[in-house]
């Protein structure tokens, strides 16, 4: 957090302010304004200490030491909040713009998401990436928006440390494959992940919750990986949740060093 400073807080919140915050629950409004909402004292404190630009902070309790802070009543916070249970601090933040550098594929391990739809899954995957030191995630344009309020909350602050890129995923994978970048994908059939030879760099592609990796992207996967059940002959669940599969996959890659 920046050094504590004294600010005079005047209740100036307007109907237009509340309307703007509420509108940011919708992806179209986030795209048009370039803004997203973050709620909760811990998350907002992390944002204040990050490189992200804060547009406005609203608080009901102890004032937040930031020039953009404004004190509001609990009733006003309830009207603004996008959560079922409002917190005492809400920030409107500028969406960061990142440039995707294709050279990272030969230098780092990168996650790729193929039309993953559930906000909870996206949030968990971003948090996992942060835990396992994966700094970049590339997403198909149909993947759920990482600045959806539910995703932002689910990341527990990891959204500040992981760069999420929305792009033409098929074209990106095609270029990576042409450059001989290892492209791993998780499938119901393939090499046993626990015995497969894994590299320290490349792309790990995770598929949609219902259909898995799409055919248009599967053609560029050079290494198909399979997470086996236990015992191997067991017949039970058809597949793993994509966030759980991501956790297992990232853990195994990092375990190898």
Report each predicted region and the residues it spans.
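Boundary-proximal intrinsically disordered activation/regulatory segments immediately upstream
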Residues: 2-61, 143-144
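RNA substrate-binding interface of SAM-dependent RNA methyltransferases
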Residues: 8, 49, 98-189
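Amphipathic alpha-helical repeat scaffolds
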Residues: 40, 117-125, 237-245
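Active-site regions of enzymes building and remodeling cell-envelope glycoconjugates
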Residues: 65-77, 108, 200-203, 222-223
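Glycine/small-residue-rich loop that forms an oxyanion/phosphate-binding "nest" at active or ligand-binding sites
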Residues: 69-94, 98
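Short beta->alpha connector loops at strand-helix junctions that form conserved
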Residues: 72-74, 114, 140-141, 163, ...
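Structured adenosyl-cofactor binding patch, chiefly the S-adenosyl-L-methionine
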Residues: 131, 146-157, 219-257
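Active-site/ligand-binding-proximal alpha/beta "capping" segment
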Residues: 185-237
